[in-house]
């Protein structure tokens, strides 16, 4: 925390920005300073705010300044704000880990090759040379993967395609740059029960110099949690099974059906579902959710 930056935040400026008066601000500051270690906990009020990224970073900086990081009773702790956010995090969407938070080293891939029953060399061939064990780009920095000069990016080409799967950029702080990046893509896919803010942003008119006339945008309707069954994991890692309430509406499909159909088109559908029973849903093959959970349990617990 730089002193010259903090010096600008006088009590009147804090009140102007936050609505918290000087007396209350001083009381909170004194309470935090005199009761250490302490933990800071937040949910979607922080993360899905219009400046969510900045607020989370500020929270971490506050805890660092107070000396509350890395000790029992301290920490900057986020509670999951929606149903099964913990569950999806557990199965490996982060750019620097595999399911179960295994690192992206060859040994981890060999573990999954063994538990999935697929050949490690086959997995290796699915990646460009050197990319299998290299961290990807985070959700808040994919913009740079499109807009930065290629020599500043640790891969052969800039990003050309993006999938927004159950995610919208409302809480990202770089909206104008994100719009430019979206317009430059070759492919943009939005998978959600409803057209999201991503779809709305993609449809907004942008600058002519940023527009890619050959860009393809696809909206794939996914089911809600009521139109499928599956497990939900809470912040405390407890697991609850949720049963299907109704059949999928209109043209919507479950996430695992969409994944399977994409894998078929890309040539590895057989490998993806080799450990799953398949069931028919509206005449289409879909992996049985219970089998997916069994494979997760076998692989990461």
Question: Over which residues does each language-model region extend?
Answer:
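Non-catalytic alpha/beta scaffold blocks inside enzyme catalytic domains
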Residues: 1-72, 78-301
